[in-house]
Amino acid sequence: MAQGGQVSAGGGRRDDDEPIEQTSGAGTQQVNVTGTDDLLDEIDGLLENNAEEFVRSYVQKGGQ
C-alpha cells in the first residue's frame, strides 16, 4: 500500500513540484545568505572587541 501511494503521489506531484521547488529553493538560499551575513557581522564585531578571548572559546582542550 505504501508503494502504491508513493508511486501515485510521486507521479502526480513531479510536474507540480518542479516549479515550486525552484522558487522555494531560491528563497531558501536568500534566507541562508542573510543569516550567514548576520553571523559574520556578529563574529567581526566580537573579533574587533576581543579576538583572543573569541579564539580561546573555540579552541579544543585535552583532545576533546
Swiss-Prot record:
Tell me the superkingdom of the source.
Bacteria
Positions with biased composition (Polar residues): 21-33
Molecular function, one GO term: proteasome binding
Which stretches of sequence are listed as region ARC ATPase binding?
Answer: 21-58
Q: How is it modified after translation?
A: Is modified by deamidation of its C-terminal glutamine to glutamate by the deamidase Dop, a prerequisite to the subsequent pupylation process.
Point out residues bearing the modification Deamidated glutamine: Q64
Q: Name one GO biological process term.
A: modification-dependent protein catabolic process
From the UniProt entry, list the residue stretches annotated as the region Disordered. Answer: 1-35
Q: Where is this cross-link: Isoglutamyl lysine isopeptide (Gln-Lys) (interchain with K-? in acceptor proteins)?
A: Q64
Whether Nuclease counts among this entry's keywords is no
Q: Which InterPro entries match?
A: Ubiquitin-like_Pup
Q: One Pfam family name from the record? A: Pup
Q: Its pathway?
A: Protein degradation; proteasomal Pup-dependent pathway
Instruction: Give the keywords, sorted.
Output: Isopeptide bond, Ubl conjugation pathway
According to the record's subunit comment, the protein's assembly and interactions are: Strongly interacts with the proteasome-associated ATPase ARC through a hydrophobic interface; the interacting region of Pup lies in its C-terminal half. There is one Pup binding site per ARC hexamer ring.
Q: State the similarity comment.
A: Belongs to the prokaryotic ubiquitin-like protein family.
Provide the function of this protein.
Protein modifier that is covalently attached to lysine residues of substrate proteins, thereby targeting them for proteasomal degradation. The tagging system is termed pupylation.
The entry's free-text remark on domains says:
The N-terminal unstructured half of Pup provides a signal required to initiate unfolding and degradation by the proteasome but is not needed for pupylation, while the C-terminal helical half of Pup interacts with ARC to target proteins to the proteasome.
Entry protein name: Prokaryotic ubiquitin-like protein Pup
Q: Which organism is it from?
A: Corynebacterium jeikeium (strain K411)
What gene name does this entry carry?
pup
